[in-house]
Amino acid sequence: GPIIQESSKIALKSKITTKQSLNLIKQLRKDSNQTSFVIMCYLNTVQKYGIKKFISNIKGIVDGIILVDLPFEEEAETKKLLDKNNIHLIKLISPMTDRIRSKLLLKEAKGFVYYISATGITGSNKLDYSEINKNVSSLKKLTKTPVLVGFGIKSKKDALAISKKTNADGIIIGSALIQKYFDAKMNFNKYITILRKFINEVKI
């Protein structure tokens, strides 16, 4: 979506490297070793860095990874390396994923399943809670892996609605957290204050 796209532009303009990003995650892990870490990125970032090198660098630092553009049909080699290093490859399932494909994805699911609440771009607005509940409930019949809902969740109201109106095991918030950085006029200290307040608000 536009928010994540804009943040990516800022990172590129600042010449942030993959190695610097991984070092930051490593430091965060040291500061909070009781917190699970899952990273989300595109396959080309990993390939350019070197798949084996990337996985070696995140071993023991992250618990899972979401490679948003890695097709299920082409994941075998990458997944094998991740499994060997105890890193979960998080599966993405959308309203457009048919039952046969869902079964294939869920068979290999570890950590949690990321259910995309709506078609379109991240940070979208309207959510159909009845449809989300129907689809999440169907997925939960096929797996014991927790099913979390993401896309379009940007407020306490949204979080409460997912909690009360669906059978989801949790929520995923991305764009809204980045938006808070822009709300803080990219002032880091102000951002941390706003972010902490927001996270406390959406905790269920």
PLM segments and residue spans:
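Short, electropositive alpha-helical surface patch
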Residues: 43-63, 164-175
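Surface-exposed amphipathic alpha-helices with a cationic face
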Residues: 25-32, 59, 79-83, 133-143, ...
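Catalytic cores of soluble, metal-dependent hydrolases
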Residues: 171, 177-186, 192-199, 203-204
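Histidine/lysine/aspartate-rich catalytic loop segments that bind and position anionic ligands
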Residues: 86-123
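Catalytic cores of alpha/beta
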Residues: 97-108, 149, 153-171
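Hydrophobic faces of well-ordered beta-strands that scaffold small-molecule active sites
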Residues: 37-41, 65-67, 89-93, 113-115, ...
